[in-house]
Amino acid sequence: MLENKMELKFLAKSENESFARVTVASFASELDPTLEEIDDVKMAVSEAVTNAIIHGYENKGGVVTICAVIEDRELTIEVMDEGIGIENIEKAMEPLYTSRPDLERSGMGFTVMESFMDNIKVESEKGKGTKIIMKKKFALIED
């Protein structure tokens, strides 16, 4: 049963990354998360949005869309861009790999997302964009 859903669209500008992170964290707050859980979500969203801006659009602008759904204490977050896409998803997800060494990127974005979320899936088509789907189950805290 679908409990709640939100969609957010914003320009692919680095100054919007913190707005996106806080918006998704606020949406997830209805699950009464621990501080650790909310920090995990913020970090993962931050990395996904930054990837869309820097790698998807190569800092040239575009629109990033975030859809978030809460169902059975699980938060599903989709971060989508219509940028250049990822040629080799498996390679892109390797720790320390970056398509932009000129920007001194660490290549840890997907690794960070994987460490903070329960599940991550990447769908991409060269020239059409990328969708990152992340899931996190929230513990039920009893008083």
From Swiss-Prot:
Query: Could you say which enzyme class this protein belongs to?
Result: transferase
Q: Which EC number(s) does UniProt give?
A: 2.7.11.1
Instruction: Quote one Gene Ontology molecular function term.
Output: sigma factor antagonist activity
The record's section on SUPFAM superfamilies has:
ATPase domain of HSP90 chaperone/DNA topoisomerase II/histidine kinase
Q: Which UniProt keywords apply?
A: ATP-binding, Kinase, Nucleotide-binding, Serine/threonine-protein kinase, Sporulation, Transferase
User: Biological process (GO) annotations?
Assistant: asexual sporulation; negative regulation of sporulation resulting in formation of a cellular spore; sporulation resulting in formation of a cellular spore
Q: Which reaction does it catalyse?
A: L-seryl-[protein] + ATP = O-phospho-L-seryl-[protein] + ADP + H(+); L-threonyl-[protein] + ATP = O-phospho-L-threonyl-[protein] + ADP + H(+)
Task: State the source organism's domain of life.
Answer: Bacteria
NCBIfam families in alphabetical order: spIIAB (TIGR01925)
Function per UniProt = Binds to sigma F and blocks its ability to form an RNA polymerase holoenzyme (E-sigma F). Phosphorylates SpoIIAA on a serine residue. This phosphorylation may enable SpoIIAA to act as an anti-anti-sigma factor that counteracts SpoIIAB and thus releases sigma F from inhibition.
Which family does this protein fall into? Belongs to the anti-sigma-factor family.
Q: Which PANTHER family match?
A: ANTI-SIGMA-F FACTOR RSBW (PTHR35526:SF3), ANTI-SIGMA-F FACTOR RSBW-RELATED (PTHR35526)
Full protein name = Anti-sigma F factor
- Organism whose genome encodes this protein: Clostridium acetobutylicum (strain ATCC 824 / DSM 792 / JCM 1419 / IAM 19013 / LMG 5710 / NBRC 13948 / NRRL B-527 / VKM B-1787 / 2291 / W)
Annotated gene? spoIIAB
